[in-house]
Design a protein with these regions (language model features):
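Short functional hotspots at interaction and active-site rims
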Residues: 1-202
């Protein structure tokens, strides 16, 4: 049986870019994780139920419009923060970090696990003082619980769909994330890990 990954084994992003608390600071830690997903008109297909002998039909769009869903969760605090953006870059990342920061308790400091995407460690990235970013090892998306969220959202609410416009895509993303974030049991089952157990309030 594999043991859960320990955040202490992760590589920290360059400290000059991120102003975290000093060693003497006594704050509650909110272990969190974040990621981004592209949702667009070139949508994914998933399996569906059908009668024996039938061949279910799934629509497929040839358009190129897409949006990006920025998502973060803190299972131990029972929090989820998301933004839907038309582009994925450093500016969008800064907006999402601000959203995460606004949900961190006054007596807490968030440690956010994330992958090595270029906008996660660019020079223009400004992390709020109540957030420290920890980078996952390269090519290890399976270590990020948020990846499970994207798979669930696509397979249950976003796949096998045709979106007429960017506005439709963003509306669908908002609907899917809201259904996930307001389902306490789903947040617990998808995102809780040994280093970030589900809150007893969930």
């Amino acid at each position: 049986m594999q043991t859960a990954p320990d955040p202490k084994d992760y590589v920290a992003l360059p400290p000059p870019k991120y102003g975290g608390p000093t060693a003497e600071t006594s704050l509650t830690t909110e272990p969190s994780c974040k990621d981004e997903a592209r949702i667009g008109q070139k949508n994914s297909l998933t399996r569906v139920w059908g009668q024996t002998g039938s061949r279910p039909v799934a629509p497929k769009d040839l358009g190129f419009a897409s949006a990006y869903l920025f998502g973060a969760v803190c299972p131990s605090a029972g929090k989820a923060a998301a933004l839907i953006m038309p582009i994925c870059n450093t500016a969008a990342m800064n907006h999402h970090l601000s959203e995460i920061s606004s949900q961190v308790a006054a007596d807490a400091h968030a440690v956010v696990i994330l992958d090595g995407a270029s906008w996660h460690n660019s020079r223009g990235l400004v992390a709020p003082s109540n957030i420290t970013l920890l980078a996952l090892p390269p090519y290890s998306p399976e270590l990020n619980p948020v990846e499970r969220i994207w798979h669930y959202l696509r397979s249950h609410w976003l796949a096998n769909s045709v979106f007429r416009s960017l506005a439709d895509i963003m509306d669908a993303c908002e609907m899917a994330w809201s259904r996930f974030a307001t389902n306490d049991g789903l947040v617990r089952s998808l995102c809780a890990v040994a280093w970030a157990p589900a809150s007893s309030a969930l």
